[in-house]
Amino acid sequence: MAASATATVGTKGVVRQVIGPVLDVEFPAGKLPSILNALRIEGKNPAGQDVALTAEVQQLLGDHRVRAVAMSGTDGLVRGMEALDTGAPISVPVGEATLGRIFNVLGEPVDEQGDLKNVTTSPIHRSAPSLTDLETKPKVFETGIKVIDLLAPYRQGGKVGLFGGAGVGKTVLIQELINNIAKEHGGVSVFGGVGERTREGNDLYEEFKESGVINSEDLTKSKLALCFGQMNEPPGARMRVGLSALTMAEHFRDVNKQDVLLFIDNIFRFVQAGSEVSALLGRMPSAVGYQPTLGTDVGELQERITSTLEGSITSIQAVYVPADDLTDPAPATTFAHLDATTVLARALAAKGIYPAVDPLDSTSTMLQPSVVGDEHYRTARAVQSTLQRYKELQDIIAILGLDELSEEDRKTVDRARKIEKFLSQPFFVAEIFTGMSGKYVKLEDTIKGFNMILSGELDQLPEQAFYLVGSIDEVKAKAEKIASEAKA
């Protein structure tokens, strides 16, 4: 493709038709641009308005015409305007220069911090790594967050679905993961805002600055690049911005040989934009009105997110489930690619358990003895069965009271409450508003702590000592402090 694309660099065509974000461009015979080439249209229309937009070639129509999808609004664009074939796909800046900056789908800075100087660029369309380059041995990605590492561990180079409504702590969890990979793994993160609210993107940027993930005084010390194609933008931008963010992440993995965290919020909007574009291009819709190429579109994005022998891209993807229907083709296609799911529960947030990760609903393909080891597996399953038993007993407790339970069940309830409290932990990025210093808990300390609760070693300690602490040593110290305060 590259050879034929290069041959048409600089070829000029003429816009013949504009229908919303879709335009037809006529080129000289034998000089048609390749599929996925970027076309640049700049100039003034007859009314004197400035027009500047990039469009991506999607179809070759015959009669020397191509059909392209605009990456920005087509307001002011008229028939007869000149379109230039760039001879290559859309390219975005990559490397250290992107850290601390916000880009649009075309890789243009939108944060009013000035243009990038002497920056390397990379095309957003490329093949997934070959099988021989992949790291096939499953490796757990330690996050330092107890509930995730113990019950739904992430795979290094894997894909995680993050499910949660408004106000349950999704953003704070994302920030903490970005903070932890920067400090503990020396890695960087890329955030792809796909089709979500502009206000949320702005709030997120400000929160990243407050928490120090983005250093506005010295951008070189930042550990995050952001790429946005929000709700108000045309479907072309929303369909491609995920690839722009992924391209930035791939450079850190392949060239800098780093472990990268890639956030996509929201993966459903990527599918939705593809559906809009498909309809605009006149393709026959598939099930529930989605594009017939749904599986291919999702696969092309997801298969590039992986671990290679050089480094890894671990992806956390927020998944919106339309009408809570998990059988909808969009989430159903996404689920096929996920290695783990992290479910945030409003009931836990209401109890003040943060992070509000549901220990019974969250899952991971990594939680098996052959991957995490027997001790980790046994501990995780024992924690889940204790919490499940507590859940079953709650109706009895509500009706008859705790005293009506057997001795064994009372012990189970007591330990389950301690486990629930111990699954909470203070976050580094929340220090500003909690006043508590954040904790990164090593996996071995997490397993040791839960084993001690399950074995009954800590039955004599008060429940409150387990709330919002890091390791089990802090629980003991907090219990002593509570005891001494009670005596005083």
UniProtKB/Swiss-Prot annotation:
InterPro entries for this protein: AAA+_ATPase, ATP-synt_VA_C, ATP_synth_F1_bsu, ATPase_a/bsu_AS, ATPase_alpha/beta_chains, ATPase_F1/V1/A1_a/bsu_N, ATPase_F1/V1/A1_a/bsu_N_sf, ATPase_F1/V1/A1_a/bsu_nucl-bd
Keyword Zinc part of the UniProt annotation: no
Enzyme Commission number, as recorded: 7.1.2.2
- Molecular function per GO: ATP binding; ATP hydrolysis activity; proton-transporting ATP synthase activity, rotational mechanism
The protein's location, in the record's own words, is: Cellular thylakoid membrane
Q: How does it sit in the membrane?
A: Peripheral membrane protein
Q: Which family does it belong to?
A: Belongs to the ATPase alpha/beta chains family.
Q: State what protein this is by name.
A: ATP synthase subunit beta
